[in-house]
Amino acid sequence: MLLDYIKSRRGAIGIGTLIIFIALVLVAAVAAAVIINTAANLQHKAARVGEESTRQVASGIQVLKITGYAVNTKNITKLAILVSPNVGDEIDLSSTIVTISNGDYKASLVYGGQITYVNTNGTRDIFNESWPNIANPTTEFGVIVLQDADGSMNNTEHPTMNFGDKAIIAINVGDVFGGIMPRERIYGEVIPEFGASGIIEFRAPSTFSEHVVTLQ
């Protein structure tokens, strides 16, 4: 009878051990599934963040040159900012903001819907003949299209720059903060909807010996 009890006891212990083993296997399987799912989510998030970071770094707009127009050789009243997109996504100028400051005032300008196209026939006078008629020059900028191979900037509501396109952002600084005086320091940014901003930073020459003045 004792022998039967011992055998029964061993059998119960064996079944208990088997149950514990199965439970451990199930727990391990659930844990593995959770880890795999978490890893997949993290990988997806990392890929998305990487794509967004690449987009921010690769795309954007660059300021190639800034030229001013001094109507009386004493005060610059017009500013022509030559811009082009970086390698990356296209740039919608209708969603672009230009900030500009002389230290005393800081203005934020938006696209006003005025475009002049000189990419086909050229122009002999950007600052007068081809200058866009900006309706609200204190708060808006116009656009002069210089290079647009695929016609992506023909839409006046959403002029869109692709890689290789070049345009001038036209600002009437005489209306924004009274113009730019000799030796005056100007700084700001051309801020696209996505990507890196173009930098505006220059100090005007001590004298304006000509009407057209290279600033940056």
Swiss-Prot record:
GO terms for biological process: archaeal or bacterial-type flagellum-dependent cell motility. The keyword Transmembrane does not apply. Pfam families: Arch_flagellin. Residues 1-11 form a propeptide. It is found in: Archaeal flagellum. One of its GO terms (molecular function) is structural molecule activity. Its main location: other. GO terms for cellular component: archaeal-type flagellum. Belongs to the archaeal flagellin family. This is Flagellin B3. It comes from Methanocaldococcus jannaschii (strain ATCC 43067 / DSM 2661 / JAL-1 / JCM 10045 / NBRC 100440).
